[in-house]
Amino acid sequence: MPSNQNRDNFIDKAFTVIAESIVKIMPIAEKEKKAYIYYRDGLAAQNNGDYSEALEYYKESLLLEENKIDRGETLKNMAIIYMSNGEEDLSIETYEKALVENPKQPSCLKNIGLIYEKRGRYAEQNGDLDQRDIWYDKAAEVWSKAVRLYPGGYLDIENWLKNSGRSSIDMYL
């Protein structure tokens, strides 16, 4: 096992050195380079499970980053952390901000739908069928958008939509 870990550490270090070299020679403004470095450090912290540190790096990156696609990716990663921490409302809010920056992120829609579907299951377990239907309908709405953006990419969601009767025939066109 240690040999695999050493190999993985070597690959991580090699990738970091290569990425840093590329960033140094790229013909981009210093501000954009700093934004990328904060993003990269946030991603590393997130991958290591240090979510509070990752959020700090991501916030610094957002202060500098101007590219909407990159901002959307950073916000999506922040939303994933909030979702992992059980901060569902903040996660949804952050996913929605990510979609404003870059509307072509089906994974944001998928994850919002997961939260809504979870709330629907919870309402059902508590016997509140009206509330269940509200949450399931909201899940179906965002999941339908995700499936349109990424056809065939979320087969489990497509099946849920069909099996729950919440699939529209034009969804797959």
UniProtKB/Swiss-Prot annotation:
Domain of life: Bacteria
InterPro entries xref list: PSI_Ycf3_assembly (IPR022818), TPR-like_helical_dom_sf (IPR011990), TPR_rpt (IPR019734), Ycf3/AcsC/BcsC/TPR_MFPF (IPR051685)
A Pfam family that the UniProt record links to this protein: TPR_8
Cellular component per GO, a single term: plasma membrane-derived thylakoid membrane
Keyword Membrane: yes
TPR repeats: 35-68, 72-105, 120-153
Single GO BP term: photosynthesis
Keyword entries, A-Z: Membrane, Photosynthesis, Repeat, Thylakoid, TPR repeat
Subcellular compartments: Cellular thylakoid membrane
Keyword match Nucleotide-binding: no
Membrane topology: Peripheral membrane protein
UniProt main location, coarse: membrane
Entry similarity comment: Belongs to the Ycf3 family.
Functional summary from the UniProt entry: Essential for the assembly of the photosystem I (PSI) complex. May act as a chaperone-like factor to guide the assembly of the PSI subunits.
Name of the featured protein: Photosystem I assembly protein Ycf3
Species name: Prochlorococcus marinus (strain MIT 9215)
Lineage: Bacteria, Bacillati, Cyanobacteriota, Cyanophyceae, Synechococcales
Encoding gene per record: ycf3
